[in-house]
Amino acid sequence: MPRGMGWGRGRGRRRKMRMIGFIPQVRHFYPAQPPVFQPKPPIFMTYEEFEALRLVDYEGLTQEEAGQRMGVSRGTVWRALTSARKKVAQMLVEGRELIILPGGNEVPRGADE
């Protein structure tokens, strides 16, 4: 088969769809007073990271329970949660903007029913 045709087109496995129970109404956070020094670029957080943070830190679920709700493994929740916590800490410590954006593979819970 010619190159670029057939089986070998994709790289790795397809990303599993993540079930999102809450789409944030406020998606852009910024400091009340912009820094006087050179501003740093904004931080981008995906819906997946936001959902993991919401379920574990806000609702108090375990990572296993959050993974079941999102339709992913506990390890995936751990990765998203670690990334989200780091981004929130960067936003607070460095006074940077935080923008929450869809990652492309999230589905609102109940949309497939």
Swiss-Prot record:
InterPro entries: RNA_pol_sigma_r3/r4-like (IPR013324), UPF0251 (IPR002852), WH-like_DNA-bd_sf (IPR036388). Pfam families: DUF134. Belongs to the UPF0251 family. PANTHER family: PTHR37478, UPF0251 PROTEIN TK0562. This is UPF0251 protein TK0562. It comes from Thermococcus kodakarensis (strain ATCC BAA-918 / JCM 12380 / KOD1).
